[in-house]
Regions:
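N-terminal secretory signal peptides
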Residues: 1-36
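C-terminal segment of N-terminal export signals and the immediately downstream linker at the start
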Residues: 22-31, 52-62
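N-terminal export signals
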Residues: 36-56
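Feature activates predominantly on carbohydrate-active enzymes
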Residues: 58-247, 251, 255-257, 261-264
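Active-site beta-loop-alpha junctions enriched in small/polar residues
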Residues: 71-73, 136-138, 177-181, 224-226, ...
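Acidic (Asp/Glu)-rich catalytic clusters
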Residues: 124, 163-167, 210-214, 278-282, ...
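Substrate-binding cleft/loops of secretory-pathway carbohydrate-active enzymes
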Residues: 265, 269-301, 332-343
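Substrate-binding cleft of secreted/luminal carbohydrate-active enzymes
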Residues: 323-384
Length: 384
């Protein structure tokens, strides 16, 4: 069969290998013999079967994203406060206690300015270049001041902090999570989901935030974990599904993109609705799959964990741009392991960079935990 194909290729000067057309330049008069030609084609055949991005030397792209997700607002979870943490002045003895205390809704800002300042400088020092800021109800929005909690930043304060970040070489990116599991920051509007009033509020906030950030490259919309299992501790639980979920997602995307900004979301909807995700998710939306375990060997993973890791491969297969997300939320190995795995399976042209998400409040009790996350990214940058 190989001889037959070679005879055919010698007639036209081309060779079909798999589904790729390999053009072979050769000079019949200069060929020493037929055997040399066969060797050349065989070598080319092997090379053509290797993904081009694996053959290319991985080099650090100066524009590659090395991001940290930091919370200005931490009102992203429960709408009720456990009895242990009813005291608003509770003295947290550890980062874990600070996280548990800040996790339920608080009508005031759970944020420490000195901790924030230290983290920004640490990020710049290790070579990170982006801060994704979970804004929530921590800003006194002009369009909806009723959302702001006590001590929320003024617009002037926010602009000042954005300027400080840019001066440090850190690109600020806004995040408003519109998933119903994480929208308690919307206050009363979190109980008006998918109504006309709700759409008006979301439209106003997206537009105002984009203006405050001077038309950022990206706008993170969240959209993760909108399932009943993630709302078991909520008093008021709501889950959109089917066309309503997609319709609302398209609404948010439309509001972002009409201002010339690119939408960015968490990708875990695909864990449970893989076929629908790849059928309906626009390629214009930047994707962040996340997995916080230590095992990345698909042959040794069982479902559903295997699907969490494999989604990196699937997003690449379908041609989506990605910013894979790791964390020190569960262990100290995940972030660097995420970088090692994803740079092997994602084409550099679609690997926009990486994000760490510590999932801890920006409070003094969690400073060391945040610094550990930054150090892990710093090591990954050096090895990339």
């Amino acid at each position: 069969l190989l001889t037959k194909r070679l005879n055919e290729s010698m007639k036209c000067g081309t060779k079909i290998i798999g589904q790729k057309k390999l053009i072979i330049n050769y000079n019949f008069n200069q060929m020493s013999n037929r055997r040399n030609f066969i060797k050349q084609v065989a070598a080319a055949s092997v090379a053509s079967s290797i993904p081009s991005f694996l053959m290319a030397q991985q080099q650090s792209n100066p524009d590659r994203i090395w991001a940290n997700l930091l919370h200005l607002s931490y009102n992203m979870w429960e709408d009720t406060v456990p009895l242990k943490y009813k005291d608003e002045n509770y003295n947290c003895a550890s980062c874990q206690e600070a996280r548990e205390w800040a996790h339920p809704y608080r009508p005031f800002l759970t944020f420490d300015d000195p901790t924030w300042d230290v983290l920004l400088k640490e990020m710049a020092a290790v070579g990170m270049n982006m801060v994704i800021i979970d804004l929530g109800d921590a800003v006194q929005y002009e369009s909806h001041p009723e959302i702001a909690v006590k001590n929320a930043w003024t617009k002037k304060k926010l602009r000042s902090e954005l300027a400080k970040m840019r001066k440090l070489g850190l690109e600020p990116i806004p995040k408003l999570n519109f998933a119903t599991t994480h929208d308690i920051w919307l206050g009363e509007y979190s109980r008006m989901v998918s109504t006309k009033k709700y759409y008006d509020v979301c439209r106003n906030l997206i537009s105002e935030v984009i203006d405050l950030f001077n038309s950022p490259r990206f706008f993170h919309l969240g959209m993760d974990e909108e399932t009943p299992s993630y709302q078991q501790r909520f008093d008021y639980a709501i889950v959109r599904q089917n066309d309503l979920w997609w319709g609302d997602l398209y609404f948010y995307i439309g509001e972002v993109e009409k201002k010339g900004v690119r939408s960015w979301i968490w990708s875990d909807y695909a864990w449970h609705h893989r076929e629908l995700f790849f059928k309906k998710m626009p390629k214009s939306v930047l994707q962040s799959n996340w997995y916080y375990g230590t095992n990345f060997d698909l042959k040794k993973l069982d479902e559903p964990t295997k699907s969490y890791v494999k989604l990196y491969n699937d997003l690449e297969e379908y041609g989506y741009d990605q910013v894979p997300t790791g964390s020190n939320h569960s262990n100290e190995q995940n972030m660097e392991a995420t970088v090692d795995y994803c740079k092997k399976v994602i084409d550099p042209s679609r690997l926009y960079g990486f994000m760490t998400a510590p999932w801890r409040p920006t409070m003094a009790e969690c400073l060391d935990r945040h610094k550990e996350a930054i150090a892990q990214v710093g090591r990954a940058i050096k090895k990339f």
